[in-house]
Amino acid sequence: MKRLVAIILAAVSLGATAQTSAQFKEKFDRQVRSVGAAGVGVEYILDKWASAYPEDTDMLEGRFNYYLAKSRSEEVQKVDAEKYLGQKPVLSLKDTLGKKVNYFTVPVFNDSLFRISQKSIDKAIELAPNALVYRFDKIGALAVYEKDSPDMAATAMLDLIDYDAAKHPAWMFNGEPVSREDFEAAVQEYCYMFYRTGSPNSYESFRILSERMLKENPKSTLFLNNLGAYWQVARRDDKKAAKYYKKVLKLAPGDETATANMKIIEKNKSKKK
């Protein structure tokens, strides 16, 4: 009888102290707001949360963010460019020959910690394949990690587009359904990120993703404008760029982007005469 009472009391005690997943998330979010994504006490909460709910996708995203932040630091590096990763230099000096030398703030990563972050978000994607937020978490992290050569990020985005085209999943983002327009707009955000980076490799990723999206929607003025921008800015080929802008204007005569860029092309053409 005493043993039975002890078991009952232990069960009652456990029920009173056990935390729900929502309570762990609330405590985690509060700690992050207080000390930052990789601050003191964050890992302790994540470990307790993971022990109680090892397949909680919110916990896995939390671990992803923790290890991503833990892996990242910044350095000031000399780069032979006027812009790097879409940013202006934080410092410009002259060398002994009078040549301008630019210094930029550049993200650097601890590879082993970064791999842990990727493993965590991969598990979240496996458990919730229709949750776009986890896929975008992964792609965004890869893009920052790779800096001016976003090959893995572009491949991950292409895989996402292919998966969307083949499976037509009912995408969700933070619990809300994602429309076709929302999906295309989200892809465009990453296209713009590659465009803004402004390196030869990132421009190619910008082109490849835009062309892939046009296979699914050949009349998308969004991605037709992208290809116009690619040829106009990355390749300096106004003639080829104009072909895409003219396609846009046939589909949407009032399109502001195509109209503005055609004016620039016409202005450049008149200067050459």
What positions do the PLM features span?
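Helix-start (N-cap) detector for alpha-helical repeat units in TPR-like alpha-solenoids
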Residues: S21-F24, T57-D58, L132-V133, H168, ...
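N-terminal leader/linker segments that initiate helical-solenoid repeat arrays
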Residues: T17-F104
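Alpha-helical adaptor scaffolds
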Residues: F173-V233
